[in-house]
Amino acid sequence: MVNILPFHKNNRHSAGVVTCADDVSGDGSGGDTKKEEDVVQVTESPSSGSRNNHRSDNEKDDAIRMEKISKNQSASSNGTIREDLIMDVDLEKSPSVDGDSEPHKLKQGLQSRHVQLIALGGAIGTGLLVGTSSTLHTCGPAGLFISYIIISAVIYPIMCALGEMVCFLPGDGSDSAGSTANLVTRYVDPSLGFATGWNYFYCYVILVAAECTAASGVVEYWTTAVPKGVWITIFLCVVVILNFSAVKVYGESEFWFASIKILCIVGLIILSFILFWGGGPNHDRLGFRYWQHPGAFAHHLTGGSLGNFTDIYTGIIKGAFAFILGPELVCMTSAECADQRRNIAKASRRFVWRLIFFYVLGTLAISVIVPYNDPTLVNALAQGKPGAGSSPFVIGIQNAGIKVLPHIINGCILTSAWSAANAFMFASTRSLLTMAQTGQAPKCLGRINKWGVPYVAVGVSFLCSCLAYLNVSSSTADVFNWFSNISTISGFLGWMCGCIAYLRFRKAIFYNGLYDRLPFKTWGQPYTVWFSLIVIGIITITNGYAIFIPKYWRVADFIAAYITLPIFLVLWFGHKLYTRTWRQWWLPVSEIDVTTGLVEIEEKSREIEEMRLPPTGFKDKFLDALL
């Protein structure tokens, strides 16, 4: 067997070490076998000496890990290895050659159940539970439903593409390898990665502000006695405290927040199904009544077939806010979760069920319980009513004669907004961390404490998210719409860059003959990614099409629709000029690094898999399949 250790990305012929193993000899009877390993130094890379110096330390760590896991395998009741043992041992600080301790790393404190629940509900916030009211009113039930199907079809290939790249090289805890900016820097171009990183950062902090703004409005459903600024302060402080804590605290909080959101949405879908068949207190069988009267499409711009098309297209632009950060959040956890390849692959595969069940079925449920011209809905949107006051689910439930449930749903909306803000804060800090580690942001932002928290990045993200205080002097609806519009286009640009990174990654994989070593492969690539890239590119350019109709022209809407594009281009071209790399707009395939760290992660994954015991019994098999 021949293993080629990582080589430098700028020289395909500077590979460091070639190992030849498994030379088998024995007598004719097949008795003893002899395994020899010859190590041949071909050309020493700068990092090979460091590997040799640390070999004894690494062997010692491996021995400790094997001993701890063997002692505790019997304690695992579901037949799988203990993830907490892996994370506790792998990322312990070991002494360096000169006696100093190594820099602190991110801790792999996220277990399988954390990653799976984050994948299912981590980024679901007010966009689905409240934001759909505006889309329903503007586009009609069919426009809402069809647009969410199209967005889901566009998003899933992106999730698969990011999952493939991150599962291949998930990082070792010293960086946030799963961030889209890091992938773009590594596989496309550092300048484009620079623009992508800062684009994502201000997208994330704006989303933190947007969700905290929405959460403050949700509380106003119950009382207006307390000023908005007080609620914003409370929500921001709780989010910051959770992100200043160890990552396992974040994972645990998101696990329970996501569980509440999932149970809430499942309950609302079931209740909508009951109302569909007339099971409410008034026994009014709804069916698809509202698809016929007032109609399936709202025709907000024009009538006929063109009106149907514009309703769907507007629904895509408006509805995309509910999907922002969904794929990225799953991959950003890769450097901080145990058994990285297995957990990220599982989360990526199951992402489709989140799209189908929550978004597609959720919007179908909304479309059958509320007409797009419902007086309560129209009045709530006109007055900017917060929280449950403008939620289409709540309006439909109230129309059915159910009294108490709206308050419960408002509580779920509050936890959803809070949870989404928590997730966006996590993403913003990891985005800053990645840029600091790749030289695209001040190095101080990359400082990590002994608990594995990038504390400087958390502090900076908190300061930027104080944009939420703009809500104190403006209505919740106006500020929320501004934030959502700007962050949605930033999300579009990030998705496009992720698609480009995957296409370059795929070329490099085939160039180096590594396709068979991909641990996670998805159907239809690269064609599905090309589909997503083209669709998102068209939407990004035309997202403000309606404002060019004279009667809809507003300068504020034009700025919100297109301000992100020049900012992104200035970041990209400015970095090119600053680094004087304008002659090369993307890395040649021969220079794309798809090998550094590959052997190590493959060996680690193989060790984990060999120690994994298959689940026994129905309960263990069910939990293994679920989480």
Curated annotation (Swiss-Prot):
Gene Ontology molecular functions: amino acid transmembrane transporter activity; L-proline transmembrane transporter activity; neutral L-amino acid transmembrane transporter activity
Topology of the protein relative to the lipid bilayer: Multi-pass membrane protein
Glycosylation sites: 72, 78
Secretion signal span: none
Record-level GO cellular component terms: membrane; plasma membrane
Compositional bias ranges of the Basic and acidic residues kind: 54-70
Database matches in Pfam families: AA_permease
Subcellular location: Membrane
Regions of compositional bias (Polar residues) in chain numbering: 42-51
PROSITE patterns documented for this protein: AMINO_ACID_PERMEASE_1
Induction: Requires the presence of GABA.
Organism domain of life: Eukaryota
Cited Gene3D superfamilies: Amino acid/polyamine transporter I
One annotated GO biological process: amino acid transmembrane transport
InterPro entries in alphabetical order: AA-permease/SLC12A_dom, Amino_acid_permease_CS, Amino_acid_permease_fungi, APC_YAT
NCBIfam families named among the record's database cross-references: 2A0310 (TIGR00913)
Protein name (Swiss-Prot/TrEMBL): Proline-specific permease
Source species of the chain: Saccharomyces cerevisiae (strain ATCC 204508 / S288c)
Gene (name only): PUT4
